[in-house]
Amino acid sequence: MASPPRGVLMSLFVLPLLALLINCCHKNLATSIRTSIIKLPGSDGSRSDAADTYCESWRLAVETNNAGAWDVLPSSCVDSVARYFNGDQYGSDYYVIVDYALAFAKTVKISGDGKDVWIFDIDETLLTNIGYYRAHGYGVSRSEPFDSKSFNEWVVQGTAPAFAASLRMYNALKKLGFTIILLTGRDEDQRSFTEANLRDVGYSGWERLILRGPDDQGKSATNYKLEQRSKLIDQGFKIHGNTGDQWSDLLGFAVADRSFKVPNPMHYIP
């Protein structure tokens, strides 16, 4: 009987070896792919083990408006938000924003006609109501919904402190020659308490304090504020800057050349 050709013998030896190598490589590649997949915090149901990480991510989402309109502060994040406000990070975040705002303000050429405007919101922008919110669950939560009656009672007291960073920014803008206009969602019948509170903590020299009148009741904050900004522009004012803690302070028509949102993860006002 004749011996098999040498090529056949080589095939019988090489093919099984090649199959073995392919199988090993496939397993190694699969293992490599599996180990390179990154699991996001909470994606495997372990969010409770990474609550702080989740809450910091949630806070970033709401501050950047990626969350859009949101309802309430997640109950799992109340402690995290409390630590944020009571620790150093909140103040640090605020001062960084103020530094950027003032850097921009210094690039503006002031005309000297009194029409170069910077707009400020009041609550959680110039004045902090953290004393009230600290006593009421740090904002709106399902366990303790917002109570407008008790908040208005707080406003009437006129004891809200100033943000040190905002006061610094406010006074620096005045020195640069900006006309300051205050645009708030507070009602007209709160004017005297609001003016007294602002002056008591160091604010002065604003051109106008605009509050909600009877015709503004029921309007969303966004619509109310864009209407007021439009009126200012119609009167010849140039809105260079705008600072507020809510996106509704800043968005819509007649926006500023630059808007600066200061942090507030306690509540959302549409």
Regions found by a protein language model. Name each.
Residues A2-F120:
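Non-catalytic pre-domain segments flanking phosphatase-related domains
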Residues T125-L127, Y133-R134, K175-I180, G185-Q190, ...:
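Solvent-exposed loop/turn segments at secondary-structure junctions
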Residues E188-H240:
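Substrate-recognition "cap/lid" segment bordering the active-site pocket of phosphatases
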Residues D113-D116, K174-I181, S204-R208, G236-H240, ...:
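Loop/turn elements at helix/coil->beta-strand transitions in domains of secreted/extracellular proteins
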Residues A69, P74-C77, G91, S111-V117, ...:
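Active-site neighborhood of HAD-like aspartate-dependent phosphohydrolases
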Residues E124-T125, Q157, S166-R199, R208-R212:
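Substrate-recognition element of Asp-dependent hydrolases with the DxDx(T/V) motif
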Residues D93-V96, Y100, E153, P161, ...:
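Extracytoplasmic/secreted proteins, especially bacterial periplasmic and envelope-associated proteins
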Residues L226-R229, I233-P270:
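Acidic, Mg2+-coordinating phosphoryl-transfer loop and its flanking beta/alpha structural elements
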